């Protein structure tokens, strides 16, 4: 079963920034040499609700894909790259994800293709990932929509977890969010909402050179975020259901 893992690393202050920047370069070779890592991206993050062009220098991420859950858990726990990042960070949260559906590409490939496309159960949490490469001359149109979307994100009490990450500030963006169920996710993402209007405008006006949309089931979490694991109870509910 293919599995994706999102590893988030939070640093206190900016004193670790030179080390982080160096690792954005130095981590690539050992990741390229690890056969169990089928895909990876090293990413920064955004401030505020996460979906902003202003970088958050304290939060960084590794998005990776594996052939099995066992590989995902072993690599993120024991590989030297993850161990180095974890040792330097003040806090680490790793989320393991089972792909349910994925369309589009990221860097020319779709790393999250499931063995079989599936819909999440009506009452289980759903993880949504959207990745877009923005055309430079469309960046203003894209980012002009973001404040209203971020405002709604901050107000939505249904949202369980959220973060915006990206490979290249302004132009390569990833939104990652977790919802209690698919109905609540669709209520935010579609229809006559700021997000729904932005999606329609993106398609009509051709904002992106590349897009990927994926849904996942939350398999498990490791570590903490802001002093706790914000998703542990949801994983426990799934395992005991």
Curated annotation (Swiss-Prot):
Catalytic activity field: spheroidene + 4 reduced [2Fe-2S]-[ferredoxin] + 2 O2 + 4 H(+) = spheroiden-2-one + 4 oxidized [2Fe-2S]-[ferredoxin] + 3 H2O; spirilloxanthin + 4 reduced [2Fe-2S]-[ferredoxin] + 2 O2 + 4 H(+) = 2-oxospirilloxanthin + 4 oxidized [2Fe-2S]-[ferredoxin] + 3 H2O; 2-oxospirilloxanthin + 4 reduced [2Fe-2S]-[ferredoxin] + 2 O2 + 4 H(+) = 2,2'-dioxospirilloxanthin + 4 oxidized [2Fe-2S]-[ferredoxin] + 3 H2O; spheroidene + 2 reduced [2Fe-2S]-[ferredoxin] + O2 + 2 H(+) = 2-hydroxyspheroidene + 2 oxidized [2Fe-2S]-[ferredoxin] + H2O
Cofactor note: Binds 1 heme per subunit.
Cofactor(s) annotated in UniProt: heme
Alphabetic keyword roster: Carotenoid biosynthesis, Heme, Iron, Metal-binding, Monooxygenase, Oxidoreductase
GO biological process, one term: carotenoid biosynthetic process
UniProt key word Amino-acid biosynthesis: no
The enzyme's E.C. designation: 1.14.15.9
An annotated Gene Ontology molecular function: spheroidene monooxygenase activity
Pathway stated in the Swiss-Prot or TrEMBL entry: Carotenoid biosynthesis; spheroidene biosynthesis
Record's keyword annotation contains Lipoprotein: no
CDD domains: CrtA-like
Protein task: Involved in the biosynthesis of the carotenoid spheroidene.
Family of the protein in this entry: Belongs to the CrtA family.
NCBIfam families: SpheroidMoxCrtARhod
Protein name: Spheroidene monooxygenase
Species of provenance: Rhodobacter capsulatus (strain ATCC BAA-309 / NBRC 16581 / SB1003)
């Amino acid at each position: 079963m293919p599995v994706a893992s999102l590893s988030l690393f939070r640093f206190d202050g900016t004193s670790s920034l030179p080390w982080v920047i160096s690792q954005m370069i130095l981590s690539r070779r050992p990741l390229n040499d690890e056969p169990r890592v089928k895909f990876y991206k090293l990413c920064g993050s955004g401030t505020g609700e996460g979906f902003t062009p202003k970088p958050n220098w304290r939060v960084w991420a590794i998005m990776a894909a594996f052939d099995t859950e066992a590989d995902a858990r072993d690599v993120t726990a024991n590989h030297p790259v993850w161990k180095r990042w974890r040792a330097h960070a003040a806090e680490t949260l790793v989320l393991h994800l089972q792909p349910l559906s994925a369309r589009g590409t990221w860097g020319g490939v779709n790393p999250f293709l499931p063995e079989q496309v599936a819909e999440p159960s009506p009452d289980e949490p759903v993880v949504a990932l959207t990745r877009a490469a923005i055309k430079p001359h469309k960046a203003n149109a894209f980012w002009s929509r973001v404040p209203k979307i971020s405002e709604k994100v901050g107000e939505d009490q249904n949202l369980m977890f959220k973060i915006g990450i990206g490979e290249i500030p302004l132009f390569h963006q990833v939104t990652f969010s977790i919802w209690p169920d698919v109905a609540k996710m669709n209520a935010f993402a579609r229809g006559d909402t700021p997000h729904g209007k932005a999606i329609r405008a993106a398609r009509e006006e051709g904002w992106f050179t590349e897009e990927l949309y994926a849904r996942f089931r939350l398999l498990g979490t490791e570590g903490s975020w802001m002093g706790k694991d914000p998703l542990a109870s949801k994983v426990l509910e799934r395992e005991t259901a």
